[in-house]
Amino acid sequence: MARLSWQPLPIQRSAMADVILVALVSGPVAAPFLAHIPFFPFPIITNIIYWMGRRVCPQPDMALMVMPPNLMTVCMRCYGVLLALVLTRLLFERDRGKGAYWLHQYRFLGAAIATVLTFAYPIEMIIELLGWWEYNNYIVTTFGFLTGLGIGLFLVPVLYRKPNLKTYSV
């Protein structure tokens, strides 16, 4: 008699990752609108979203004004990272990690490329803080997007791969 070992179904893992990604992308934009709704539970949800944004974004005061007087919860640099993660998720759904642009298949070289792309965010922020250029939403979104591509092109295939189900005989 053969038994299957318990493993999470692929749909569970990818569905959970998709729910988290949707929350991360929609939360910063939704929070300013939710802040204008005084009815329970919207103020609580808004406070949670803003609290999370202040914890992850190094410059939340540079966020876009979406619904005056409320800003998005993260700056466009951080939001660029999230947009790139959404793009890589959609690309993965199209080719299931088989395209030449997926960095995990290049092992060390792919990890090196992902690392270089990931450092675009902090390098741009340091250059801005040193005064080489002023904060510009187009620039910071681009550098955030590059960082998100580095993260996404390397990790999305790992997060969304289908686990191998092994059978064991008793």
Where are these regions (language model features)?
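Small-polar-interrupted transmembrane alpha-helices in polytopic inner-membrane proteins
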Residues: 23-28, 54, 84, 104-130
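Interfacial helix-loop-helix junctions of multi-pass membrane proteins
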Residues: 60-76, 122-146
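Extracytosolic (periplasmic/ER-lumenal) interhelical loops and adjacent juxtamembrane/interface segments
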Residues: 36-74
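N-terminal signal-anchor transmembrane alpha helix
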Residues: 12-42
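Hydrophobic cores of alpha-helical transmembrane segments in multi-pass inner/ER membrane proteins
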Residues: 21, 83-90, 145-161
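Membrane-interface helix-boundary signature
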Residues: 7-17, 103-113, 133-139
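Hydrophobic alpha-helical transmembrane segments
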Residues: 73-95
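Membrane-interfacial, low-structure loops and terminal tails that flank and connect transmembrane helices
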Residues: 1-11, 95-108, 164-170
